[in-house]
Swiss-Prot record:
Organism per entry: Human T-cell leukemia virus 1 (isolate Melanesia mel5 subtype C)
Motif interval(s): SH3-binding: 72-79
Domain of life: Viruses
Induction context: Down-regulated by P30II.
Miscellaneous notes: HTLV-1 lineages are divided in four clades, A (Cosmopolitan), B (Central African group), C (Melanesian group) and D (New Central African group).
Motif Nuclear export signal, residue range(s) on this chain: 187-201
This protein's name: Protein Tax-1
Motif (PDZ-binding): 349-352
Length: 352
């Protein structure tokens, strides 16, 4: 399900980007307005980022580093390739597979809305079958239930490519629910399982307050954040640099961030509004800020609900101006005749 290297189109802004291969994990890059993964030493930066410009070894275009994977990319188109460049530009595979007991998957199938080997959430769209492939391949996502919400645990990189800004660097997990699937497993073993997941992924793990009675799995050992959950929503936390993975619509309908269901289809749906794009026109806002304020939402379905009229006329200077890319404050600049910003009640912060 790999996407060939080539030129594509930005999912959000519509500008051309260069795609080297499968997308990878990353963080928000305020300089370029793209994504950057320092841990993996791979970058997802715009071709116009002044600090990361190099020449494409194939056709001489200015694109970025040879280890860069530009996100977003939708769609991607083939370009001239050689076996040498493909070897350099294709990301490595994951060489290990997590050891998850079969009873977990059996219980998920029993307690989840599985139909024909796929999960069917309330929005009526199918997600890939829950499974882990053979070692040497990238496992797909792991889905479970918490309350009335479907919870997705990203254990490894996605097998299909992902799109901006959905990042498998935050694991949103409820150990009690996980323990319900694993019979006769004490909490200490749950903590050890989570800690092993952290060691294999390097992900930040978000746990509900008071979920573990012991102190084995604490921030001193791994970057675990204990915080209150509100109907599956991850509250805003200034310490988080990536958005959480599980969100719900305003009416409480769960949304699941997952891989694209079919080859060539987007894994990200950005539900837009005019105010969101006024914010994007003025500042490269961090996606977690927009998420926490309820301004953007995610799901993993077939269509992209993004009216093109809302961003086709955005001046390029607003996207790449250094001052506008500075995300040190969250106060939007409303252009003349633009929409008013939301009231302060939309900007709640939750202390951890």
């Amino acid at each position: 399900m790999a996407h060939f290297p080539g030129f594509g189109q930005s999912l959000l802004y519509g500008y051309p980007v260069y795609v080297f291969g499968d997308c990878v994990q990353g963080d928000w890059c305020p300089i370029s307005g793209g994504l950057c993964s320092a841990r993996l030493h791979r970058h997802a930066l715009l071709a116009t980022c002044p600090e990361h410009q190099i020449t494409d070894p194939i056709d001489g275009r200015v694109i970025g580093s040879a280890l860069q994977f530009l996100i977003p990319r939708l769609p991607s188109f083939p370009t001239q390739r050689t076996s040498k460049t493909l070897k350099v530009l294709t990301p490595p595979t994951t060489h290990t597979t997590p050891n998850i007991p079969p009873s977990f998957f059996q219980a998920v199938r029993q307690h989840s809305p599985f139909r024909n080997g796929c999960m069917e959430p309330t929005l009526g769209q199918q997600l890939p079958s829950l499974s882990f492939p053979d070692p040497g391949l990238r496992p797909q996502n792991l889905y479970t239930l918490w309350g009335s919400s479907v919870v997705c645990m990203y254990l490894y990189q996605l097998s299909p490519p992902i799109t901006w800004p959905l990042l498998p660097q935050v694991i949103f997990c409820h150990p009690g629910q996980l323990g319900a699937f694993l019979t006769n497993v004490p909490y200490k073993r749950m903590e050890e399982l989570l800690y092993k997941i952290f060691l294999n992924t390097g992900a930040l793990i978000i746990l509900p307050e008071g979920c573990l009675p012991t102190t084995l799995f604490q921030p001193i050992r791994a970057p675990a954040t204990l915080t209150a959950w509100q109907n599956g929503l991850l509250p805003f936390q200034s310490t988080l640099t990536t958005p959480g993975l599980i969100w719900t619509f305003s009416d409480g309908t769960p949304m699941i961030s997952g891989p694209c269901p079919k080859d060539g289809q987007p894994s990200l749906v950005l539900q837009s509004s005019s105010f969101i794009f006024h914010k994007f026109q003025t500042k490269a806002y961090h996606p977690s800020v927009l998420l926490s304020h309820g301004l953007i939402q995610y799901s993993s379905f077939h269509s992209l609900h993004l009216p093109f009229e809302e961003y086709t006329n955005i001046p390029i200077s607003l996207l790449f101006n250094k001052r506008e890319a500075d995300d040190t404050d969250y106060g939007p600049r409303i252009p003349p005749g633009g929409l008013e910003p939301p009231s302060e009640k939309h900007f709640h912060e939750t202390e951890v």
